Amino acid sequence: MLSLLSSDSSLLSLLFLFLIPCLFITSYIGFPVFLLKLIGLIKIKAARDNEKRDEGTYVVREDGLQRELMPRHVAFILDGNRRWAKRAGLTTSQGHEAGAKRLIDIAELCFELGVHTVSAFAFSTENWGRDKIEIDNLMSLIQHYRNKSNIKFFHRSEVRVSVIGNKTKIPESLLKEIHEIEEATKGYKNKHLIMAVDYSGKFDIMHACKSLVKKSEKGLIREEDVDEALIERELLTNCSDFPSPDLMIRTSGEQRISNFFLWQLAYSELFFSPVFWPDFDKDKLLEALASYQRRERRFGCRV
């Protein structure tokens, strides 16, 4: 009983301390104005409480990654398929097939972790210099992304698929299939898989320059209109809401970007994994993302 009285007394004291200032304020500014201000303060407090309560959802507790620090766009250079196959006593074709399957697995993991855009250097312009059998295998593997299982994944997870590159040497039948999958998924907004096929960073920049020259000749743009933002709109990655990767991952231990996203990687964080692409699994992905989240991105400025 004493504890109850004590509790009630404390409550009455708190109410008294609250009401006295309120009565003074209302007599000074008027009750309606005071009421509006009080409601506004309550709303602000509720919003802040919601932010604090939601902070727990930002951390992916299983692996310790923070969702608010997750890269929006992760780019991959899929390197090491042939060496992986040779080490395993398999054919080059089997190595590329394993690499194609791995891309879907890793893309799905990225999307689950909150990454918006995943891009992959699937076939470079320089790859045309390889022997015809391997080129044919690589072209056929692009069709792998249109098999029933992957199509179901794209629609189930609402993944938009885009294929960027020169495309002038790609067989007409394959171009038709590429167009079909792009059209079928173009309505999806929150997840985006970009595959660079017959792509090079130099070609991308050259393509943008030619487009700007044509627009200038037609009087659509002036010299003073040309800035970084305008050039970026002409790059092939303009299909993405986040055209510049926050993180670029290359497998196989090679430490170079090999003519991939020369403009877009200007301020990207780079991570080089020693494993061949078919061996790049969830643990390796989490390792790369954890490394990214520990870094302080300065974008050329001192902090």
Curated annotation (Swiss-Prot):
Q: What class of enzyme is it?
A: transferase
- Quote the cellular component terms of the Gene Ontology held in the record: endoplasmic reticulum; endoplasmic reticulum membrane
Under Gene Ontology molecular function, one entry of this record is: ditrans,polycis-polyprenyl diphosphate synthase [(2E,6E)-farnesyl diphosphate specific] activity
GO BP terms: dolichol biosynthetic process; protein glycosylation
**Which UniProt keyword terms apply here?**
Endoplasmic reticulum, Membrane, Transferase, Transmembrane, Transmembrane helix
Q: In which tissues is it expressed?
A: Expressed in low levels in the whole plant. Preferentially expressed in roots.
Q: Where in the cell is it found?
A: Endoplasmic reticulum membrane
- Catalytic reactions of this protein: n isopentenyl diphosphate + (2E,6E)-farnesyl diphosphate = a di-trans,poly-cis-polyprenyl diphosphate + n diphosphate
User: Known InterPro entries for this protein?
Assistant: UPP_synth-like (IPR001441), UPP_synth-like_CS (IPR018520), UPP_synth-like_sf (IPR036424)
Q: What is its main location?
A: endoplasmic reticulum
Q: Which protein family is named in the record?
A: Belongs to the UPP synthase family.
Say what the protein does. Answer: Catalyzes cis-prenyl chain elongation to produce the polyprenyl backbone of dolichol, a glycosyl carrier-lipid required for the biosynthesis of several classes of glycoprotein.
The name of this protein is: Dehydrodolichyl diphosphate synthase 1
| Source species of the chain | Arabidopsis thaliana (Mouse-ear cress)
Its organism's taxonomic lineage begins at:
Eukaryota, Viridiplantae, Streptophyta, Embryophyta, Tracheophyta
